[in-house]
Curated annotation (Swiss-Prot):
SUPFAM superfamilies: Ribosomal protein L29 (L29p). InterPro entries: Ribosomal_uL29, Ribosomal_uL29_sf. One of its GO terms (molecular function) is structural constituent of ribosome. Gene3D superfamilies: 1.10.287.310. The lineage of its organism: Bacteria, Pseudomonadati, Chlamydiota, Chlamydiia, Chlamydiales. Keywords: Ribonucleoprotein, Ribosomal protein. NCBIfam families: L29. It comes from Chlamydia abortus (strain DSM 27085 / S26/3). Pfam families: Ribosomal_L29. This is Large ribosomal subunit protein uL29. GO terms for biological process: translation. GO terms for cellular component: ribonucleoprotein complex; ribosome. Belongs to the universal ribosomal protein uL29 family.
Length: 72
């Protein structure tokens, strides 16, 4: 099973509260990564930007599926 499918399966098992916490943690991590890049304190791993953004998008999609707001 690919990493993406494992993540989606894991996200679908979480409750809405757990999904909110997961989204919040990932947004905080993305913000701190952007701050590090702006301050240029460390060598920033740029591939993490897209990884966090995609993870946030996937988790928000699963959250909307649970709320019944996704078409398709």
């Amino acid at each position: 099973m690919s990493v993406k499918k494992k993540l989606l399966a894991e996200l679908r098992q979480k409750s809405l509260v757990e999904l909110d916490a997961f989204i919040h943690e990932n947004k905080k991590a993305l913000f701190s990564l952007r701050a590090e890049a702006a301050l240029q304190n460390k060598a920033v791993k740029t591939h993490l930007f897209s990884m966090y953004k995609k993870t946030i998008a996937r988790s928000m999609t699963v959250k909307q599926e649970k709320e019944g707001k996704v078409d398709g």
